[in-house]
């Protein structure tokens, strides 16, 4: 991959991982600490997680464009690109599943008295999965020569 694209890919993966880290491990816990009610914090967190979804989608789609086979020059780096691409795709799928599957179930569980703990826990695990995928992508891209 050309030098500019390689640097842009590292930048995108850093943005993806950093935004997941900042939101999930700093911003949302602070919302629950400082807002008056947990319901108010949860509503704000939901909006922020939704915005994070679209940032993640943009970063992963651009990464996938940069990692396609036409941009990879050598067979050895092609194999590495496939591994990195797999982490990006898994992260993208988790992002979309949380936004369009789990988030809706959390809203339904809150409204109907359903199993909110189950859906919140599943969403948290999937968010952690996204964070791991983004971190592995950043790690592998930043160590490429």
Residue ranges and their predicted role:
Residues 10, 50-53, 82, 86, ...:
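Internal alpha-helical transmembrane segments of multi-pass membrane proteins, especially GPCRs
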